[in-house]
Swiss-Prot record:
Binding site for Zn(2+) 4: C284, C338, C340, C345
Residues annotated for S-adenosyl-L-methionine binding in this entry: K201, G202, W203, N281, H282, Y322
S-S bridge residues: none
This protein's name: Histone-lysine N-methyltransferase SUVR3
Molecular functions (GO terms): histone methyltransferase activity; metal ion binding
Gene name, Swiss-Prot/TrEMBL: SUVR3
Keyword Nucleus: yes
Source organism: Arabidopsis thaliana (Mouse-ear cress)
A GO CC term attached to the entry: chromosome
């Protein structure tokens, strides 16, 4: 009769052995890599002080964030450069286009290591960076332009050279599709840019390549506000500016009738949610950018788009004129100092009561 082989007694395992520690550490790292990219800089700094591992992850995140302000939402990475102080990047929620205003607090956005696909395990989606997204509102009439092809005589949309003050583009319904040559501004940033820290002006947007006259730079993206909400926020921003170092990015744009009378007011706030245009500074000489109020066929509202007003060389700061309206009153304390450095600098930034 064959004798059954006796099984060896089970080995006693002690807590803390490598087989227990490694899976636990792996789970810890995976959780950290999923959670930390949602944190803002202040929260990240607090977490970094808790242990060496989280400190290393936080430092890695800081490096990744400084490499691309656009969080892979544009065609090209837009890095931060700072040789002035220890601030590696400016924190805000990125959107490539206009979105309806969000209620406070602002939504969070993943900002971690670059990923090619939204929805992957390493990069959760942020659904407010779509023209409908979580707001359930579309700013575009999907019917768009019905032209057969974008050529003179076939398309009613105006093809332009980036020098007009008001112009039109084909919309999403164009028969040419997304490759239409008259939908330049709808394809996002396509020139190399970088964000540089200046001792006087703070963050500035610079060209990182030669940009030819008439080339599209970017649109001014942010939250679309009602006039009442714009006034409410501006009051808050003014109070913050009086007590601390604070810079807002609330821009008021007016579309005028041929008679010169304003017919449409658009309030775009890029302070909390915006794109790289929030870093474009004022220049009293008009700067090197031209602004175009551009309507895409079928769109409900125009967009403020920036084009090169002349050839712009690499390492040149991008700037435009904020306007000619000055704050009412003689109190200079109510005005913001201008540091544009142009020969015709007026010393204060153009602004108006919203």
């Amino acid at each position: 009769m064959q004798r059954l082989r006796e099984s060896p007694p089970p080995k006693t395992r002690c807590l803390g052995e490598a087989s227990d520690i490694i899976p636990a550490a792996d789970r810890f790292l995976r959780c950290a890599n999923l959670i930390l990219p949602w944190l803002n800089p202040r929260e990240l700094a607090v977490v970094a002080q808790t242990c060496k591992t989280l400190s290393l992850i936080s430092k890695s995140l800081t490096i990744h964030r400084s490499l691309d302000a656009a969080r892979s939402l544009e065609n090209i990475s837009i890095p931060f450069h700072n040789s002035i102080d220890s601030q590696r990047y400016a924190y805000f929620i990125y959107t490539p286009f206009q979105i309806p205003a969000s209620s406070p607090p602002p939504p969070r956005q993943w900002w971690g290591a670059a990923a090619n696909e939204c929805g992957s395990e390493s990069r959760p989606c942020f659904d407010s960076v779509s023209e409908s997204g979580r707001f359930g509102v579309s700013l575009v009439d999907e019917s768009g332009c019905e032209c057969e092809r974008c050529e003179e005589g076939y398309c009613k949309c105006l093809a332009f050279a980036g020098m007009e003050e008001i112009a039109n583009e084909c919309g999403s319904g164009c028969g040419c599709g997304s490759d239409c040559s008259n939908r330049v501004t709808q394809k996002g940033v396509s020139v190399s840019l970088k964000i540089v820290r200046d001792e006087k002006k703070g963050w500035c947007l610079y060209a990182d390549q030669l940009i030819k006259q008439g080339q599209f730079i970017c649109e001014y993206a942010g939250e679309l506000l009602t006039t009442d909400e714009a006034r409410r926020r501006q009051n808050i921003y003014d109070k913050l500016r009086s007590t601390q170092s604070f810079a807002s990015a609330l821009l008021v744009v007016r579309e005028h009738l041929p008679s010169g009378q304003a017919c449409l007011r658009i309030n775009i706030d890029a302070t909390r949610i915006g794109n790289v245009a929030r870093f474009i500074n004022h220049s009293c000489d008009g700067g090197n950018l031209s602004t175009v109020l551009l309507r895409s066929s079928g769109a409900l509202l125009p967009r403020l788009c920036f084009f090169a007003a002349k050839d712009i060389i690499a390492e040149e700061e991008l700037s435009f004129s904020y306007g000619d309206v000055s704050v009412a009153g003689e109190n200079r304390d109510d005005k913001l100092n201008c540091s544009c450095g142009s020969s015709c600098c007026l010393g204060t930034l153009p602004c108006e009561n919203t």
